[in-house]
């Protein structure tokens, strides 16, 4: 019995502690990322943004948290109560579970699995289920139409993201996220794969329902989309899941194209900075790009969104996969692992 506890109990306890620490850190970072998003949007519109709760509004997200927690959860008449309440939980759990394989530094990862990129792709694909469950269970036409839009949108852009990932893994020669970062020591992949970087960034906006691709929650058409019937903690969980997913896509952009935790130049003093600092700086830089797109770019029409995904991104990404394979084989530079 003691041997079993030592063999399985201690490693499980360590993983549980690491997971708890990661979740707490993610929730804190998400609170301030949400505040930064609101501040950036306000600055673009020549406003101050949240500035009352705490110094410079730094405690605004926590005030919003308390406000949501103490409000009443209202379930619409005729709604499927079980699925209605399960939908936000599914969204949050899937968003958080994706971070289990994200390496913040060379050895700072909970599960350094060999198919990490495949795991992330699967988790991000499942995220649409929370939206569909919410739209169907609300027993209202606006959430239902929003769920249909979200399903079509996410499926459309998953295809392009898949081909982008194929280009990166062919160049790196591995599905392991740590190995992909290490393979960028000579050159970050956004330089040779610049078109794929642009496609991945724009597809990430569509995948996370960020403007200008927030068709699923377009206020002028669908009120608040699939969240229109939600209130209190359930609504807060949807917002939390959305921003954790955004941070996950920012982290994936950093790992696949921006060298992860690697410094821009491998000389002093750059290589003296801890890798996790470089990783977080790159993630926040990508999020800043997300926020600026939200502030400046108007929302696309639904037909424009579908046309961009199927008639522009899909052919370009497919062509780039063939081109990458041809270059690797033609110049005999296929990575050996």
From Swiss-Prot:
It comes from the Bacteria. Belongs to the complex I subunit 1 family. GO terms for cellular component: plasma membrane. NDH-1 is composed of 14 different subunits. Subunits NuoA, H, J, K, L, M, N constitute the membrane sector of the complex. InterPro entries: NADH_UbQ_OxRdtase_su1/FPO, NADH_UbQ_OxRdtase_su1_CS. Pfam families: NADHdh. It catalyses: a quinone + NADH + 5 H(+)(in) = a quinol + NAD(+) + 4 H(+)(out). One of its GO terms (biological process) is aerobic respiration. It comes from Parvibaculum lavamentivorans (strain DS-1 / DSM 13023 / NCIMB 13966). NDH-1 shuttles electrons from NADH, via FMN and iron-sulfur (Fe-S) centers, to quinones in the respiratory chain. The immediate electron acceptor for the enzyme in this species is believed to be ubiquinone. Couples the redox reaction to proton translocation (for every two electrons transferred, four hydrogen ions are translocated across the cytoplasmic membrane), and thus conserves the redox energy in a proton gradient. This subunit may bind ubiquinone. It is a multi-pass membrane protein. It is found in: Cell inner membrane. The chain crosses the membrane at residues 9-29, 50-70, 82-102, 115-135, 161-181, 186-206, 245-265, 273-293, 313-333. Its EC number is 7.1.1.-. One of its GO terms (molecular function) is NADH dehydrogenase activity. It is an enzyme of class 7 (translocase). Keywords: Cell inner membrane, Cell membrane, Membrane, NAD, Quinone, Translocase, Transmembrane, Transmembrane helix, Ubiquinone. This is NADH-quinone oxidoreductase subunit H.
